[in-house]
Amino acid sequence: MKIVKVVYTTTVPYAAQNQVNIQNVMSDLQRSDRPGINYSVCLCADGKTFMHLAFFRSDDDQKILNELPSFKHFQEQLKANGFEIPPVQELLTLAGTSKAIFKEQE
């Protein structure tokens, strides 16, 4: 399993569009129902800092997300609109969970 956390801060004017783009990615992931991808995004209290947390069963699952047209669009738009604070990526190790992360484990 691979766990990726990414945190960045957008400009205030772009934050709402970023949320729309994120929702488009989530809708596509929900439709595709990929069991090896568990992906969440939270918006911090400042209304412009986003924290992405992605759990991938395999590198192939991560590749599926990275090649998703809506995800590519999200990334392109985010880069084009600039950051107040650029993305910081961190690989995490799971210490514990209250529920199964992937559907087949339920």
Model-derived features: where do they sit?
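Short S/T/G/P-rich N-terminal loop/turn motif that feeds into the first structured element of a domain
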Residues: M1-P69, N81-E106
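Mid-chain, well-packed structural core segment of small domains
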Residues: H73-E76
